[in-house]
Amino acid sequence: MTLSETHPTARSEALFVRARAVTPGGVNSPVRAFRSVGGVPRFIASAQGAYLTDADGARYLDYIGSWGPMILGHNHPAVRDAVAQALASGTSFGAPNEREVELAELIVELTGAERVRFVSSGTEATMSALRLARGYTGRKFIVKFRGNYHGHADGLLVEAGSGLLTNAEGDLGAAAPSSAGVPEEYAGLTLVLDYNDPEALDALMAQRGDEIAAVIFEPVVGNAGVLIPTSDFLAALHRVRDFGAVLIADEVMTGFRLSLNGATGLLSLDPDLRCWGKIVGGGLPVGAYGGRADIMDFVSPQGPVYQAGTLSGNPLAMAAGIATLRELKANPGLYRQLDEYAARLAAGLRGAAERAGVAVSINHIGSMLTVFFQDAPDGSVRDYAAAARSDTAAFAAWFQGLLARGIYWAPSQFESIFISAAHGEPELAATLEAAAQAFEGVKP
């Protein structure tokens, strides 16, 4: 008997009806609506460790982790206690506080960044970093990569995530907006290339390098499914600085997840600026950007590039971030544990898919993993065009099979899942059993 048979979704259905009456689409972030997989989104009532409990009382083994922040697991006691202690002193001051200094010092220590500035989201972090790069260089064009998602600022909603659009013929890097409401004039300042195409990047920089303020990239892509960079591509990225462009690593997803120094540490990167979010706030709304002092000192009030925020450095969010990073720093073996779990999960999923006769290609790095429903060798999906060849209907059927068996997977073919410290042997066994049954329900 499946979870869907023992726990009807009446409460979630009723909440979804109410939500649609007052909120566009009934959700506050589009992927939560289950549009690409069908069915009723689960309204969550509580979370603990590796598990979620929905409004109807059904319990799910969670592989979303609030889309990345919950690397320690949900409601971790150290984080909860730190927030409770901070709460006793007030919720927001609109003034400097000691905790923001302490969290900045931790980030500097763990990442090597020379300066850090806090904001309230990953979108704010990338938006601010690009404004800073333009102010520092005096240039206006930026370069991003097809399928890389950097938040929902107008200039970044250009061929972002699943919003793939055809490149304009004859104009290297030209692209169109991924969303209504983004003027073409904004999109015209964003040049888009294929991820993992070093030749195209070299060609663009040779052609227009003196116009480029910044090149922004995800070291590991997560919003087109997990895409892993090649060494040649990483080398080409670092060459953009020869043209005076600022190299910005968007580590909102990978920061503190792939290592204590994020993808920068794992992949031996050397960006000028980095953007963080998710884990850095321990589950509360925090973003940050930082890097070279000579660039960061252009930020107001030190320099001429304005950026501000009412809730930047919020004491509750800072407390959660400090507690999370302290736990990670105190447990350096955690990253090996997460990687081993992901490797065993990938191997088990591969075997289950083969036994069911379902074609899949699995990408994973550290605690991030995507199962692409397509007939290709594992690790061979390297750019958005390859990811887009996946069978989304087959994925949706598999997702529903998992959900019915109590596994809460990312509700999109083009997303990463996230493994936490709370995932152990019982969770791995339960996942592989449910996945095998769900694969049997996918029509070849």
From Swiss-Prot:
This is Glutamate-1-semialdehyde 2,1-aminomutase. Belongs to the class-III pyridoxal-phosphate-dependent aminotransferase family. HemL subfamily. The gene is hemL. The keyword Cytoplasm applies. One of its GO terms (molecular function) is pyridoxal phosphate binding. Its cofactor is pyridoxal 5'-phosphate. Keywords: Cytoplasm, Isomerase, Porphyrin biosynthesis, Pyridoxal phosphate. It comes from Deinococcus radiodurans (strain ATCC 13939 / DSM 20539 / JCM 16871 / CCUG 27074 / LMG 4051 / NBRC 15346 / NCIMB 9279 / VKM B-1422 / R1). It is found in: Cytoplasm.
